[in-house]
């Protein structure tokens, strides 16, 4: 380490944020809040109730594993309390729910249907689109053993995505079950945990590497374009063929996929039980009116199968976007969930059936922004301070607007007319209210509709014509100001 690295930071160098903890401006904050409002509105419509837990949980209560994390307890932020117990920031909204259910016991009626929204934290290496702090919005049913509860989660998740603006064909929820895959692994003789994990990792790369690349990873191994060699799962040719037949059994309809799976899943009892799970879910999805295009049965979905105990589902955006490099790519996963019947057993020894669905709010907000689906911000009406001898008048006008329920502010800077207009434009103001000495004397105000003014200004050829026309600008008595401004705001809304 150099002397420079050990020197204390001073001045501007001190102004830095920790890696993976993004600052958010109003646009993104507003978009996230709108998504939370919309998604939780769907959850409430389906009969779920709100539950809020603290940001910290005792580290030993969180458990020794994370979803999709190969390093137990590697992904949390922890501090030691003054009683020497370790507390961790929650890494998801499910582990606190499990603790709540175990602690509340029978005082919580079952089935217990709850939703929650809030930030979670992961102590992982940050990167593009990968943060250490992000928002999730979950719904869970605790105490419902039937697979109709899983189907409900899936159908409700699809409705939530449609509610935020996704159309059929722009997203898909893929469904699989752990027991079905276990049956396939059993039929090909994958007994050891290492072999099973290698197979899961290989199948997870099917979209990226295709059948040929996955076949290499299921067999002896794969040499990539950079020359790096990845050791394979060590399956023989017949076993590789069987696993690929299972992973590629997806078809146009859920019924066709199930028919293909009945042939590819093998003869193990575990595989048959998994197939029965998916058949029950498919029947329930039909009853719930979940469109075929929104929800598919996809045996290649393996992410999370080591965490969940039964069905697993992954929500993915299908719309392609163009990156800064000019290449097109899919945004990918924006949510998912599954059945986790063992989570509460860590506390009580009792197997409590539970299933849930989570929408990644931060990821979805970023995805919608990339796709150009921005939320229009309602900027404040700005009251310009044009009479330096009577600065309190602008305060009085802004107060009148706010008391009428309109969002408004008086300009507090030191700029002149041009600078104040630029400020109002930057704030996204629908209108400005101007009160100079002439208006004060006449008991009037001048109101400029910034949106209409900009539209009309495009047709004006000269500065002289612009000054004469004053596009989008009206003068009204002060007692008519509120209604005049309200009409402008509502017309733009």
How should these model regions be labeled?
Residues 2-3, 28-48, 57-58, 93-106, ...:
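Positively charged, Gly/Ser-enriched RNA/tRNA-binding surfaces
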Residues 71-83, 189-219, 317-321:
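Acidic, His- and aromatic-enriched active-site or binding-groove loops in soluble protein domains
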Residues 109, 168, 192:
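A short alpha->loop->secondary-structure connector
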């Amino acid at each position: 380490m150099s002397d420079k690295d050990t020197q204390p930071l001073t001045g501007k160098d001190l102004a830095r944020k920790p890696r993976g903890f993004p600052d958010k401006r109003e646009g993104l904050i507003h978009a996230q809040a709108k998504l939370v409002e919309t998604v939780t509105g769907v959850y409430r419509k389906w009969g779920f109730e709100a539950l809020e837990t603290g940001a910290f949980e005792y580290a030993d209560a969180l458990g020794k594993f994370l979803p999709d994390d190969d390093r137990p307890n590697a992904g949390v932020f922890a501090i030691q309390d003054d009683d020497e117990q370790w507390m961790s920031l929650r890494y998801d909204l499910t582990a606190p729910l499990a603790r709540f259910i175990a602690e509340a016991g029978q005082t919580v009626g079952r089935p217990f249907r709850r939703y929650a929204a809030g930030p979670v934290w992961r102590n992982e290496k940050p990167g593009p689109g990968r943060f250490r702090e992000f928002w999730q919005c979950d719904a869970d049913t605790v105490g419902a053993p039937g697979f109709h509860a899983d189907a409900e989660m899936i159908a409700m998740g699809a409705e939530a995505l449609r509610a935020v603006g996704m159309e059929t064909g722009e997203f898909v929820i893929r469904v699989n079950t752990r027991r079905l895959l276990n049956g396939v692994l059993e039929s090909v003789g994958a007994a050891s945990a290492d072999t099973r994990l290698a197979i899961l990792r290989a199948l997870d790369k099917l979209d990226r590497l295709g059948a040929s690349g996955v076949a290499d990873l299921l067999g002896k191994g794969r040499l990539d374009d950079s020359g790096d060699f990845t050791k394979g799962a060590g399956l023989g040719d017949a076993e590789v063929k069987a696993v690929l037949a299972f992973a590629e059994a997806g078809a146009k309809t859920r019924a066709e996929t199930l028919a293909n799976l009945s042939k590819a899943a093998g003869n193990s009892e575990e595989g048959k039980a998994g197939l029965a799970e998916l058949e029950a879910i498919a029947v329930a999805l039909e009853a719930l009116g979940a469109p075929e295009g929104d929800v598919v049965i996809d045996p290649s979905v393996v992410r999370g199968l080591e965490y969940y105990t039964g069905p697993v589902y992954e929500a993915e955006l299908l719309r392609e976007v163009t990156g800064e490099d000019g290449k097109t790519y899919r945004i990918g996963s924006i949510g998912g969930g599954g059945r986790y019947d063992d989570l509460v057993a860590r506390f009580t020894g009792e197997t409590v059936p539970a299933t849930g669905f989570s929408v990644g709010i931060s990821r979805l907000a970023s995805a919608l922004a990339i796709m150009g689906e921005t939320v229009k911000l309602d900027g404040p009406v700005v009251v310009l301070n044009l009479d330096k001898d009577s600065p309190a008048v602008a305060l009085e006008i802004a107060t009148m607007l706010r008391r009428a329920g309109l969002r408004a502010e008086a300009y507090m800077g030191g700029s002149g007319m041009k600078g104040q207009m630029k400020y109002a434009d930057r704030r996204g103001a629908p209108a400005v209210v101007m009160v100079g000495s002439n208006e004060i004397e006449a008991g009037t105000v001048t109101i400029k509709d910034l949106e209409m003014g900009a539209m009309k200004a495009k047709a004006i050829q000269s500065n002289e014509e612009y000054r004469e026309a004053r596009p989008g600008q009206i003068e009204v008595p002060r007692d008519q100001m509120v209604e005049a401004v309200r009409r402008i705001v509502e017309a733009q809304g």
